[in-house]
């Protein structure tokens, strides 16, 4: 039977030994890994273990399967590993097997220890006496690929050999015969030049127009709400940044009109009703017709308030078009009306002809 566990407390070796005992087994082999108190002249206080538990248990189960495939006589297998802080002289890992003969038990435990160190994702950190932060250690048994800085920078041409040889290469084809450092330098210079060209075009597209051009010609027919000036971003991957945003009009640059109008529209106790009536009749009718506001209230102050709200709504919705909106007046509408044709009866036509004859005879 296989016994696999990752524990956070002290490992009970006697309990593991009891799991291995069997009537048919004549040998039991137990390996106990403990924490020593020194490493390279440094005094070790404790060890800390961390693990990817799901993957670790899966790999430990595979190790048990390999042990049974190589040594079919194994009866019981136990692999216990401790996680967290392990003080000096305490067990961090226990691997034990039981078999009818000692050779299978001893060889299987040795093989399991090597496989556990090289395959199972468990990481060890050593805590020293004068260094509470500690240092992570890598397993020497793990087959890490050995790379040097030079090998990482150079390309291994032997891995992709070119079997076909080409003779009589045309002169029009560009052939670069330089080392890696010179080639990298040329590529960097090319990328830098292309980036500078892109930055220059972007600045020309978004820069402020010349002061010699009249402002009226540039802003009158513009639908933009803001005028943004963009310049090159120095020492950064982004090459543009907003220097200033100039909002010439709109509700974002205006004061709180609603609060101010509510204060102004508050009726005063000493107001004369007659003056209010004359003022309303002289101005409000034309303003309401121009703003397309219907007079729903008899109170003049409320009617003015409705007109002001209408103006604020139009300006906030589209402030850049407020100077272009022109509504037709009543006088223009009357001029556009077609004259009504008069209808003449036969009797009236006869009278008109008789009158003309009399004037001619006289």
UniProtKB/Swiss-Prot annotation:
Subcellular location: Cytoplasm
Catalytic activity reported: 2 [molybdopterin-synthase sulfur-carrier protein]-C-terminal-Gly-aminoethanethioate + cyclic pyranopterin phosphate + H2O = molybdopterin + 2 [molybdopterin-synthase sulfur-carrier protein]-C-terminal Gly-Gly + 2 H(+)
Entry GO CC: cytosol; molybdopterin synthase complex
Chain positions recorded as substrate binding sites: 101-102, 117, 124-126
Top-level EC class: transferase
A molecular-function term among this protein's GO annotations: molybdopterin synthase activity
Pathway: Cofactor biosynthesis; molybdopterin biosynthesis
Keywords, alphabetical: Cytoplasm, Molybdenum cofactor biosynthesis, Transferase
Pfam families associated with the record: MoaE (PF02391)
A GO biological process held by the record: Mo-molybdopterin cofactor biosynthetic process
Protein family membership: Belongs to the MoaE family. MOCS2B subfamily.
Subunit field text: Heterotetramer; composed of 2 small (Mocs2A) and 2 large (Mocs2B) subunits.
HAMAP family in UniProt: MOC2B (MF_03052)
Function: Catalytic subunit of the molybdopterin synthase complex, a complex that catalyzes the conversion of precursor Z into molybdopterin. Acts by mediating the incorporation of 2 sulfur atoms from thiocarboxylated Mocs2A into precursor Z to generate a dithiolene group.
Further comment found in the protein's record: This protein is produced by a bicistronic gene which also produces the small subunit (Mocs2A).
Name of this protein: Molybdopterin synthase catalytic subunit
